[in-house]
Amino acid sequence: MEFSQYDDNNNLSLTKFESMLKTNNVLFFDSNEFENIIHHYLDNGKIALAKKAIKLGLEQHPTSTNLKLFRIEVHVFENKLDLADELLNALYEIEPSNEEVFIQKANIFSKQDNHEKAIQTLQKALELSEETSDLYSLIGMEYLFLDKFEEAKSSFMKCLETDNEDYSALYNIIYCFDFLEQNKEAIDYLNTYIDSNPYCQVAWHQIGKQYFSLKDYNKALTSFDFAIISDEVFIGAYLEKGKVLEKLSRYEEAIENYKITLALDDPTSFALLRIGKCYEK
């Protein structure tokens, strides 16, 4: 489902809805307003309010597919899987080409630990959808549940090809490489990614960690430097750079980097411990 960005009108709708709940008056909202209100409540974990909005929304707009899908989504969240499945089957009869029906169906299969069936269902959704990034991500997660790391990696790569700023997908790709102990392959992949995204601090940070695992400390150091150039308040890069400098016996420089992390955020026990170890050496 597509949702409009929250703006003044959305905030007014939310205020209007919450004011209505405090009175006995029932006000009219168009279906898009209900969708944004429900989306807001679900995003903020306010399930009871979301359910009230869904109930009233369907009373005012009984044929709204998106509101029906929200109702199903809440049933799945509450593990009312049989009821959700029954409602989905009824919706499928009306809209057999709606990819959201397949996504929610896959969600049910996943909750039932039937991950292979979830993948097959998500692949059907792929055939119907123009927006594929989130679907590839969902498929990747199902493969992770099955410990099929090569397949998961491939799915997350497709996700990143569709949206090259999806850092969650990038982290998942590296997780798969790490589990498969494919450090060199990970470096090759990250280098290709960096060619198109030269100022991506996440990629530089990850490539530095790969070099660190291979004990190529000089290349790791260069990578963390580039991560810091890309984002000079990236605490993780300073911590990793400090670890590399320790390996190179450059303890004073390591201390400097650990101290930077203390200035950027609340002190971590790791940074304080490493500073103490460096002073000992």
Residue ranges and their predicted role:
Residues 57, 90-91, 124-125, 158-159, ...:
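Canonical positions in the second alpha-helix
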Residues 60, 93-95, 128-129, 162-163, ...:
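Structural marker of alpha-solenoid helical repeat scaffolds
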